Amino acid sequence: METPVGLRFCPTDEEIVVDYLWPKNSDRDTSHVDRFINTVPVCRLDPWELPCQSRIKLKDVAWCFFRPKENKYGRGDQQMRKTKSGFWKSTGRPKPIMRNRQQIGEKKILMFYTSKESKSDWVIHEYHGFSHNQMMMTYTLCKVMFNGGMREKSSSSPSSSGVSGIEQSRRDSLIPQLVNNSEGSSLHREDPSQFGDVLQEAPIEDAKLTEELVKWLMNDEDDAQIEDAIPIEEWETWLNDIDDAKEKSIMFMHDNRSDYRPPNSLTGVFSDDVSSDDNDSDLLTPKTNSIQTSSTCDSFGSSNHRIDQIKDLQESPTSTINLVSLTQEVSQALITSIDTAEKKKNPYDDAQGTEIGEHKLGQETIKKKRAGFFHRMIQKFVKKIHLCSSISRT
């Protein structure tokens, strides 16, 4: 029997005794109480078989039944409480039920055991009513309760009967519907495991690309091979072309020196910021000395003064000559460095290469390093020319 929405069957202990137990035991017509509570031999059935036989469910996870008394022996009041899977055992002392300071009944608590030491979550609150004639009290009211969750109740029961079986079947019937709906819908969820390979491959590919890029940047063999393929005569021709262009720019500045307007006074000395390795340190000395002894910065000393001091350029042609001879000194420094490098190739190096067994490889390495040094020195020289040109134009 289903109760209307908003109504709950939750009588008190006093109402159970007065309004249900007494009429069930004394009245001839018990239909008014039987319509709500069914009569079942509770202590002969396993607890998971009882929910399906209840006519109404209480507010809690509980079910009410009338149980006829069944004495275990001919004498005494000991009841039959053994089932197929276990037994019901009384725990604690009975709790008296009072009305107007008079005891009208008592409540006993029974626990269901599947063995002597295995206690389950099934509990019975058994109500006994008192009257003047105790021979008339042939029924008790049992409130069967389950203290565990619905999942535990369904797993503890060997058969899927009762309310737990109905609810379990409802859940099982809903699962295929949800699966079918999810498969037919456009919002079907993808399995995240299928993207695991992609997420793992991306960092690996990035690491490989970074490693190859670093190797390519650190590898100077390609540049050295290109530099070795260019003969020294072409380097000298290229330097001469730069000298001609520089002489033209210097002469143009000399002819138009009266139009020069320096925005700010320039001070300081140009420094060589490009670093080279330890193997080229000895080759760097001639170039550095030649530049320091030349008039690279002194030739442009006129840019550090005002317009009235530029007239000194006409009186001192030595500055112009020094400017013109700048590139010639750098070219001479290159030739000197080449001669110095050739002289440093002594028999000791050849003997050492022979002992290692890599004489040819050692010569190629020295040649590549020498060409790389020339290339870096030319780059620094071009940077200085561009810097001087920008200063002269301003």
Swiss-Prot record:
Ranges of residues in domain NAC: 3-147
Primary localisation category: nucleus
Transmembrane segments: none
Cellular component per GO, a single term: plasma membrane
Record field: compositional bias (Polar residues): 286-300
An example Gene Ontology molecular-function term: transcription cis-regulatory region binding
Any one Pfam family match given in the protein's UniProt record, by short name: NAM
DNA-binding positions: 104-153
Keywords from the named record: DNA-binding, Nucleus, Transcription, Transcription regulation
Localization (cell): Nucleus
Domain of life from the UniProt record: Eukaryota
Domain text: The NAC domain includes a DNA-binding domain and a dimerization domain.
Protein name stated in the entry: NAC domain-containing protein 3
Lineage of source species: Eukaryota, Viridiplantae, Streptophyta, Embryophyta, Tracheophyta
